[in-house]
């Protein structure tokens, strides 16, 4: 993620230098990027470990564990989504099971594009589309699935 952040800064700096008149007209920046992934940030605001992205398949066993803990129908009825490896929640459960020392350091979990947003603005946040893709969002209530979060102890 730090390489991505450095590349973002270099690209923006280059564009501003190349197009100073146009860059003076910028009123805002929008973020678009990879949906599925897990970026973990500690209380100090720094990355805890490398991101786990959507293509990572290591959390297969954690998917069944999530369903066992929450009840498959309850889970799916809340998030309106099926679980898959590489989703934020399944990857987070993998970290909880296999990297307890890293799990304990977590203050925030964000999606990859939201890490860039955080670095640029200093604010943690996401949008409804990405939130729902993390598979721990109550889509009907448009809020985090706090009941599931409590059951999973995350």
Which stretches of residues belong to each language-model region?
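N-terminal glycine/serine-rich phosphate-binding loop of ATP-dependent small-molecule kinases
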Residues: 1-49, 61, 77, 105
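Residue-level structural signal for beta-strand termini and adjacent loop
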Residues: 52-53, 130
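Carbohydrate-associated surface elements
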Residues: 56
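Short, charged, surface-exposed secondary-structure boundary motifs
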Residues: 61-65, 136-138
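Short, surface-exposed amphipathic charged segments that create phosphate/polyanion-binding patches used
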Residues: 66-70
